[in-house]
Amino acid sequence: MALLQISEPGQSPHPHQRRIAVGIDLGTTHSLVAAVRNGVSECLPDAQGRVLLPSVVRYLDQGGRQIGHEAVAAQVWDARNTIASVKRFMGRSLKDVARAGQLPYDFVPDAAAQGMLSLATVAGNKSPVEVSAEILAALRQRAEDSFNADLYGAVITVPAYFDDAQRQATKDAARLAGIPLLRLINEPTAAAIAYGLDNASEGIYAVYDLGGGTFDISILRLAQGVFEVIATGGDSALGGDDYDAALVDWVLQQARRQASTPADRAALRIAARACKQALSATDIAAFSADISCANVHVDVRRADFEAITADLTARSMAAVRRALRDAQLTRDQVQGVVLVGGATRMPQVQRAVAQFFGQPPLTNLNPDEVVALGAAIQAHQLAGNGGNAAELLLLDVIPLSLGVETMGGLVERIVARNEPIPTAKAQDFTTYKDGQTALAIHVVQGERDLVQDCRSLARFELRGIPPMVAGAARIRVTFAIDADGLLSVSAKEQGSGAQAHIDVKPSYGLSDEQIARMLQDSFATAAQDMKTRALVEARVDAERMLSATQSALAADGEMLSARERAAIEALMATLSAQREADDAAVIEAATEALAQGTQAFAARRMNRGIRQALAGRNVQTL
């Protein structure tokens, strides 16, 4: 009979050794899988020793497919069926896809998900979720082959600026790939985990993450194993692909050529990427591509490349400045800058970062691998495998404020941007009209004061509110955001217990323009927004005062003399005329005048109510 081996708690030499947990960096250009082995986080190679898996999937007729390296070459001669950079399409609608006309794909509406896009291939229409699932499945297989065991779970990284739709699409892709998802974490946060544990870093750090398709900047406070993201920013339509596209446009202009077919565009993109990478090591490199029976050959100087892409680098640095402003920090307070993403190898990027912060960026770890390495450490912890990672505390934040619409089209923020997640916040609201039995709740996202300037996330209704006078009901609205950044909203009437709930799963993501514009607009229009909000609030208060006074007159008007009633009605007429004025102070003055003019009436009503409540009662019964 086999004997059980018993160890002291936490002292087993190989606790949970069969829990194979990995970190996956699902990237725009390349994807990686990493795991902690023998206490060290490392990327897992394929059979040929390659750790980078090109994020490319080629669909064949009869249901076949090629994934990764074997699909890369087909981008030139089978561009329509060879899908690259699919991460840029996750959670997006057709109208959200920038430069769709320049891409070699046939975009069609997704029949299964209203508002979403799919890509037409020889194997049928494929959604970005399905394409991403192919890449994830290949990485899962690599991990299981490496350990010769089934996968327990994975932590998958996403850009910090991914919204709810894009995060949900990533979770769906993991499920489709057969991967038990332990958690989604932000890519910059994963990089901080890797650097923090490897170097025992403490203090304020910036993580500058320029990948193939997205740019993220995160400001983090690292102290004694606690990773707190205190500000985030970025651009979901800025990455290495955009540098490639700018180079292609410039080369075609120099060569006086045009890309007339999808195969031409694919060949030019591949040549641009190779030229860009060469220019990181040399001052001049050849751009060479065969298109439409002609060869395009241009010698590109690094200075030329930096000039034509200067605006892209400047866009990233503008986001860095905004993130520091959000964190209420100066660049001098940042102890170090971590570079993430293969695009950060470009000299102009490293130079811009160094000049801005006044110090060279950290490059201890491979920028292509650092995100996967950090995700693997987090997965190791979540799987219960112990080690130093067991003491790690991770605090991500939400990138944009969340709130609800109130009267007058104003936004009442419930969860402020840069709030650490997971979190739950609640706020009490009330009814606006007498006898109101339902409340429409409109959930919005953004930094502006007016609903029309923010992004609508969801709408739902709370019904079954007992009829009562305006302002008597107490409705608690709760926002709960899980560790993956996904939102659920509930509303409950405190007296009756009536409640409603919704999981916010928007049908499409933010457009490229919206993401770049939302924060910029909030700063540029702050003063005007404040003035507009004050005006709307004054009008709402005036309307509420008029409605309450009208109800009081209808219920207890006989308590007033004709002269008193006429005085109140005159004040009401003045307020009614002034409430459409464009000056909040004028409206507030008229509202206050009516409030003062009805004080005696309100006191009489209160006294009558008390007398009626006490009628027939004595001290003992009270």
UniProtKB/Swiss-Prot annotation:
SUPFAM superfamilies: Actin-like ATPase domain, Heat shock protein 70kD (HSP70), C-terminal subdomain, Heat shock protein 70kD (HSP70), peptide-binding domain. One of its GO terms (molecular function) is ATP hydrolysis activity. Keywords: ATP-binding, Chaperone, Nucleotide-binding. Pfam families: HSP70. The keyword Cell inner membrane does not apply. One of its GO terms (biological process) is iron-sulfur cluster assembly. InterPro entries: ATPase_NBD, Heat_shock_70_CS, HSP70_C_sf, HSP70_peptide-bd_sf, Hsp_70_fam, ISC_FeS_clus_asmbl_HscA. Chaperone involved in the maturation of iron-sulfur cluster-containing proteins. Has a low intrinsic ATPase activity which is markedly stimulated by HscB. Belongs to the heat shock protein 70 family. PANTHER family: HEAT SHOCK PROTEIN 70KDA. This is Chaperone protein HscA homolog.
